[in-house]
Amino acid sequence: MEEAFQSDYKKRGCRWAGAVSLPPLPKDALVLETGCGNGKTLSAFSCRAVGVDISSEAVRLAGAKNAVAGDVRALPFSDSVFDAVFCWHVLGHLMEADRIKAVSELFRVTKPSGSVYFKAFSASDFRFGKGTEVEQNTFLRGDGMLTHYFSVDEVLSLFGDGEVFENNWSMRIRGVEHPRSEVIGIFPKNRF
């Protein structure tokens, strides 16, 4: 996985563009963005933010002093540090056992009063089924990118109690409409 991202960032530079819509957070909040990539979302936070990405090339492109190379399965941070942890379109690039490890790490670095914010593609997305299926609902594309497509129930099973919903929209590509779909969730650490 790391090699695929390193290669792609070196070849294309910026992978994702577009406006970022963030939930309101207190100005004094400390936020972690996992999979910070080129820093697009990291730079949009109006509070203190730290980014981590498996690709050192992405971290270099982000040009941010507050971004480090690291793995979401073994985050290089102490316990209970962040008020909010964002994991947007990261877990879908992992196999099931690694997704479970990563979720444990996300909660480990979140303060007891904090929350984990999740977003990933759902099985309703038009790209579902493209590539070679390597696990249920997980596909390996020709460029080496692994993508898992989630269901709401799967996300609840992975994270536990929280607010989860599916967001559907349409994207026009070369004059043809394609269905896009994400599962989005917010999971307070202190759920009990």
Segments predicted by a language model, with ranges:
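A short His-aromatic
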Residues: 92-94
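A short glycine-rich, Lys/Arg-flanked "PGG" loop and its adjoining helix->strand segment in the class I
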Residues: 100-112
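Class I (Rossmann-like) S-adenosyl-L-methionine-dependent methyltransferase catalytic domain
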Residues: 1-74, 98, 115-192
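A short acidic, Gly/Pro-enriched loop at the edge of an enzyme's catalytic core
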Residues: 73-85
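A short beta-strand submotif of the Rossmann-like class I SAM-dependent methyltransferase core
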Residues: 87-90
